[in-house]
Amino acid sequence: MTTLRIPAMSPSGPVSVYRWRVNFDAYAHRAVDLVNAPLGGLDDLKVLLRDESWMREEAAERDIATFRRAQKKLREVFELGAGHRDMDAVTALNALLELHPMQPRISGHDAADWHMHVTSRGASVAAEYLAGAVWGLAVWLCEYGSARFGVCADERCGNVYLDTSSNCCRPTWTGRAS
């Protein structure tokens, strides 16, 4: 998320308050991170969740199968994008959106740390992570098109990527967000 300083009004005049802006690209990067991650066991899952301390702490063996299923289905979306099969990518993403629905809510203790969660209170680690990843990739597809994501063309690689380059012309993910 990005921190913005926005002036707010109080009885004594404007005050500066921190506000959070939702960064949908960060959610799309979750999809990339998941697809490219090894998921051999709980330790691997915790590495994937390294930037989200509460998720890392609450991750359990029961989450691994859910993450693996989503990993496979998300890879298919990236492969469809790489193959210029836009309608199929949209269909696959819509199916994932149904499997991992969002229920956005505002969280925080006061105006200085309001932020969004993509699932309801008490949702599992898998529900929170996957709803965000799928939503982020769907927003990315709508914003940039499937030509801006795919699978690395280097046969030794196979990683998926989001193309953040200025000219959208590299067949491998070097220099791209992965």
Go through the PLM ranges and name each one.
Residues 165-176:
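Cysteine-rich micro-motifs
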Residues 160, 177-178:
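Residues that scaffold the ATP/ADP-binding catalytic core of kinase and kinase-like folds
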Residues 1-151, 155-162:
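Short helix-coil boundary/hinge micro-motifs
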